Amino acid sequence: MQTHEIRQRFIEHFTKAGHTEVPSASLILDDPNLLFVNAGMVPFKPYFLGQQNPPFENGTATSIQKCVRTLDIDEVGITTRHNTFFQMAGNFSFGAYFKEGAITHAWTLLTNPVEEGGLGLDPERLWVTVFTDDDEAAEIWNKKIGVPEHKIQRLGMEDNYWSMGIPGPCGPCSEIYYDRGPEHGQEGGPIVDDTRYIEIWNLVFMENERGEGLGKGNFEIVGKLPKKNIDTGLGIERVACILQDVDNVYETDLLRPVIDVAQEVTGAKYGADQANDVRFRVIADHSRTGLMLMLDGVTPGNEGRGYILRRLLRRIIRSARLLGATGETLEKFMDTVRETMTPSYPEIAENYERIRAVALAEEKSFLKTLESGSQMFDNWAHEAKERGEDTVPGDVAFSLHDTHGFPIDLTQEMAAEADLKVDIDGFHELMAEQKARAKADNNAKKLGHVDQTIYRPFVDNHPTVFTGYENLADEASVLGIIRDGALVETAPEGAAAQVILDRTPFYAEAGGQMADRGEMTSTSGAARVEDVQKVGKKVWVHHVTVSGGELAVGQKVQATVDKAWRHQARQAHSGTHLIHAALREVLGPTAVQAGSMNKPGYLRFDFNYGEQLTEHQLNQIEEIANGAVDSDYQVNTIETSLEEAKAMGAMALFGENYGSEVRVVEIGGPFSMELCGGIHVEHSSQVGPISVLGESSVGSGVRRIEAYTGMDSFRFLSTEKSLVSGLATSLKTPSEELPDRIDALTAKLKAAEKQIQQLRAQQLQGQVGQLVEKAETIGEVKVLAEQLPEGVAAGDLRTLAMDAKNRLGSEPAVVVFASVDGEKVPFVAAANDAAVDKGIKAGELVKTFGEKVAGRGGGKPAMAQGSGSDAAGISAGIEAVKSALRG
């Protein structure tokens, strides 16, 4: 039975029984503490925790959830039991049925004949386990289902009591095992041999509430849940192994085809060598996981989810190389995964070009450094063994990471293969130093390269009170003044200084929002506030220029934020939230923020996405964001605990460190809800019009949208309107017909340019006969090396060179032509068969020529071409070619 049919039978069984089918959630959820969805019940957590009411008819649901677990990446391939991606089929009840219902459903589906919609497993080969004290479940299995008592084994809390690992719902569970037969191990049930008896289905009877505690079974039961719930999980891949009668998941219809393709690509044979078998299995497992992660929008990166994907893809590439592959291989593996997984996940087909592009870009990037990095490691390992060393130093691992792009896990893997260890602490120290240097340099730039220890007394003893959420002005005391890197008592007129106040209404740069501008005044002077930065997240440092009189430590000042600046900054920041929400509505939940910057009237928003956005998508995003503006949503800020914020559905950034108390900015209820400490408008209508300028790439898998808000958006639209009006007047065409008019003019221009090129080529071709007469003999070779008139494109040069070569006859002959085409210097070399037989290579000649014109080129012995940028070197290039032919 094919895996896709197993999935269908599972869903059909439960939907016929009144369960609501729930599509698989994305592998990526809005949970900063969860790398990937790793269990079938994860999307249902809000219902089990009582945070939301289950919306399912009859109070029951069924799903087949995509899952990824990455703790065992290093074990993948070494054993046949570990996979990074798997499919968890489950049925869920929220007070509708309990133990007897769950047990009956599972047994019926597993043992009913295939012709009746079941999976047709032999009941005699099924064993079950129950929690030690769960007499009720044991009795149901024995009395209701008919499982013999000796096949019902009891286990303790460590094995048969489920919880989420934190205080909350929990309960005993019952697991169903399949006996693979005596050839797989000793008799006696799962408590004796879990290799022979494999777990296929876990039934969790969620009825209690657990308290604090560590470990699987080290906690107390503190109460009963108001409803008794059911959460089950069946491993699709494990059932496929049984029904396809194969030893492990790598032999199933999902992964074996990838191994077969890997054999073709590499020339190695699966099953012939243990080390190579591990590599084959790594390729199969990681190719599937990689594709499914990219399907859900993950792109390779250096942190978090992106790092996991990068690690998986680079393990595939290296494994293929070690098996004997040359060149690029990922596309073939991904193509095979597409074929095996699309029947279950048809969305792969419409997203495949994006997935393929992301994978190939990562492969090209890694192949550039794989060989040099591997050579560096091999050389070091050889020398280290000769010295009797057994540990790769942290600096070597750091160099492989920093220079060659080797994830530390890959270096550890290579070290293990060479019977070496890695100084992982030393590596992390160097990584931390690098990050600290970058952070210190960034902070130093922001703080005017002042030694930050000067701020320590203020950070420790006088944290700034921020009043800017409520006020645009406040009275404050001057606690400190810094000039030229030193604490001073006063700052005179014209001086640039950093001023520290006990309280301030000025927003300091944070969260992508530019700092407020404004002024501070006292009885003795005034200063312009030109920037505000935080030190130690506690002290606001105001960068000022004293505009009159002087400021002094200890005096009172009136700190006033520029009202217009703040208003436009608030528009941009709230506009950023609207753009983010619109992006996710158009592109899906994987379009997660990667960075942002907003200043008065302007915003830019970076997000994880693997391909260029279409004009239609940009228009959709702009329309949705402006629709939110038009809806005049209320903007609310809520200060609450991190857990409560997540329960509310507030979006948090993965990998970001949040405190126990957070601030939630909510725009229009569910439309946008994010953790944010920034300044925002009171109503979405105050953002004003949002004009999306466009989008661009800012790195591998990261795109950027830029937009204007408020009056800047209006001015942009006004300028665009004037531009369109001017074009319409110049072209004597109504504005709505401009696109067609411009297309027609462009087509005419291209046709005219093509005609000019053809006429020029004909003219030059007519002159080829005259050029051939200029050929000279060098040794035994006829050589025609000339600079042609300006404006001859590379393609025409090639045609002319071929014509000239043919006219020079059958004796050894070489042609080298060059021209100046705009800012480029195209050049070409052609050699006839007789010249090639004498060892002359056109590719070598263009390399010689290219050195003189700041260019490069290459090709085959008979024809090669290149391009340079220094037209002044053409004559020298011609002479260099002639010298090379003279020998």
UniProtKB/Swiss-Prot annotation:
Its recorded name reads Alanine--tRNA ligase
What's in the keyword line of the UniProt record? Answer: Aminoacyl-tRNA synthetase, ATP-binding, Cytoplasm, Ligase, Metal-binding, Nucleotide-binding, Protein biosynthesis, RNA-binding, tRNA-binding, Zinc
State the protein's purpose. Catalyzes the attachment of alanine to tRNA(Ala) in a two-step reaction: alanine is first activated by ATP to form Ala-AMP and then transferred to the acceptor end of tRNA(Ala). Also edits incorrectly charged Ser-tRNA(Ala) and Gly-tRNA(Ala) via its editing domain.
Q: Which cofactors does it use?
A: Zn(2+)
GO CC annotation terms, alphabetical: cytosol
Matching entries from CDD domains are given as: AlaRS_core
Q: Which GO terms describe its molecular function?
A: alanine-tRNA ligase activity; aminoacyl-tRNA deacylase activity; ATP binding; tRNA binding; zinc ion binding
Q: Which gene encodes it?
A: alaS
For whether the record's keyword set contains rRNA-binding, the answer is: no
Q: Where in the cell is it found?
A: Cytoplasm
Domain of life from the UniProt record:
Bacteria
Q: Name the major location.
A: cytoplasm
What is stated about domains? Answer: Consists of three domains; the N-terminal catalytic domain, the editing domain and the C-terminal C-Ala domain. The editing domain removes incorrectly charged amino acids, while the C-Ala domain, along with tRNA(Ala), serves as a bridge to cooperatively bring together the editing and aminoacylation centers thus stimulating deacylation of misacylated tRNAs.
| Organism ancestry | Bacteria, Bacillati, Actinomycetota, Actinomycetes, Mycobacteriales
Q: Which reaction does it catalyse?
A: tRNA(Ala) + L-alanine + ATP = L-alanyl-tRNA(Ala) + AMP + diphosphate
Which SUPFAM superfamilies is this protein grouped with? Class II aaRS and biotin synthetases, Putative anticodon-binding domain of alanyl-tRNA synthetase (AlaRS), ThrRS/AlaRS common domain, Translation proteins
Q: Which family does it belong to?
A: Belongs to the class-II aminoacyl-tRNA synthetase family.
Question: What is the top EC class of this enzyme, as a single word?
Answer: ligase
Annotated GO biological processes are: alanyl-tRNA aminoacylation
Sorted alphabetically, which InterPro entries does this protein's record hold? aa-tRNA-synth_II/BPL/LPL, Ala-tRNA-lgiase_IIc, Ala-tRNA-ligase_IIc_anticod-bd, Ala-tRNA-synth_IIc_core, Ala-tRNA-synth_IIc_N, Ala-tRNA_ligase, Ala_tRNA_ligase_euk/bac, DHHA1_dom
- Statement: the UniProt record of this protein carries the keyword Transmembrane: no
Bound how, and how many: what does the cofactor note say?
Answer: Binds 1 zinc ion per subunit.
The residues the record assigns to binding Zn(2+) are H573, H577, C676, H680
